[in-house]
C-alpha cells in the first residue's frame, strides 16, 4: 500500500507523515517472520534496501522534526518487533547525483518512474541530512557512511566473518 500511496493512487494519504510511516512499517511487518528467521540463521547474510532508518529519515525530513525518529524506532523495533540490523549502510552520495540516477532510471525503465518523494528535490536533500545524522549517532546500531564500495565490502566481510556486528568499521 505504501508504494501505491507514493504514486498517488491512495488519495491524499501521502499528506500525513505518520500515516505513510505506518504504511512503510506495516509493509516490513508483513515480512517480519521471514526477516526474523533470516536474522537468526547462522551463516546467512540478509541485505535490505530502505529498512527502518529510511522511514525515520524521510519522516523527519518531511516533518522538519527529529522527534519522529524515536517514534519510528519504537513502532518498528519495539511494537512490530522487527530485527535490529547488524550494520546499516548509508550510501553517502550527493542528493544531486542521486537525482540524476533516479531520472536516468525513470527514463530507461517505465517501471521505475519517480515517486512523490523522489520528485521533491528539497525532501531528498533534507532526507540525506537526516541520514547523515542517523549514521553519525549510530542510530539503532552500527553504521558505515560512505560511497566507497571497498569500504562497504570490508565492513560486511567483518560481520560475516565474525558472526557478529561488534567490530568498528565506521568511516
Where are these regions (language model features)?
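Hydrophobic/aromatic beta-strand patches that form the interior of the parallel beta-sheet core
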Residues: 47, 87-89, 142-144
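A glycine- and Lys/Arg-enriched "phosphate-lid" helix/loop adjacent to the NTP-binding pocket
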Residues: 55-129
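ATP-dependent small-molecule kinase phosphotransfer cores
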Residues: 1-80
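Short beta->alpha linker loops
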Residues: 27, 51, 93, 147-151
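NTP-dependent small-molecule kinase module
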Residues: 96-171
Amino acid at each position: 500500500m505504501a508504494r501505491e500511496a507514493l504514486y498517488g493512487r491512495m488519495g491524499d494519504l501521502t499528506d500525513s507523515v505518520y500515516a505513510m510511516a505506518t504504511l512503510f512499517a506495516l509493509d516490513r511487518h508483513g515480512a517480519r517472520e521471514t526477516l526474523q528467521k533470516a536474522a537468526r540463521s547462522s551463516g546467512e547474510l540478509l541485505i535490505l534496501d530502505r529498512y527502518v532508518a529510511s522511514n525515520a529519515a524521510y519522516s523527519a525530513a518531511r516533518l522538519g522534526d527529529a522527534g519522529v525518529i524515536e517514534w519510528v524506532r519504537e513502532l518498528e523495533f519495539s511494537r512490530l518487533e522487527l530485527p535490529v540490523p547488524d550494520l546499516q549502510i548509508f550510501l553517502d552520495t550527493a542528493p544531486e547525483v542521486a537525482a540524476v540516477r533516479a531520472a536516468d532510471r525513470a527514463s530507461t525503465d517505465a517501471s521505475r518512474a519517480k515517486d512523490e518523494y523522489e520528485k521533491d528535490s528539497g525532501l531528498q536533500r533534507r532526507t540525506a541530512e537526516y541520514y547523515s545524522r542517523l549514521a553519525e549517532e549510530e542510530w539503532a546500531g552500527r553504521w558505515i557512511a560512505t560511497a566507497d564500495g571497498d569500504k562497504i565490502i570490508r565492513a560486511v566481510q567483518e560481520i560475516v566473518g565474525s558472526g557478529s556486528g561488534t567490530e568498528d568499521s565506521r568511516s
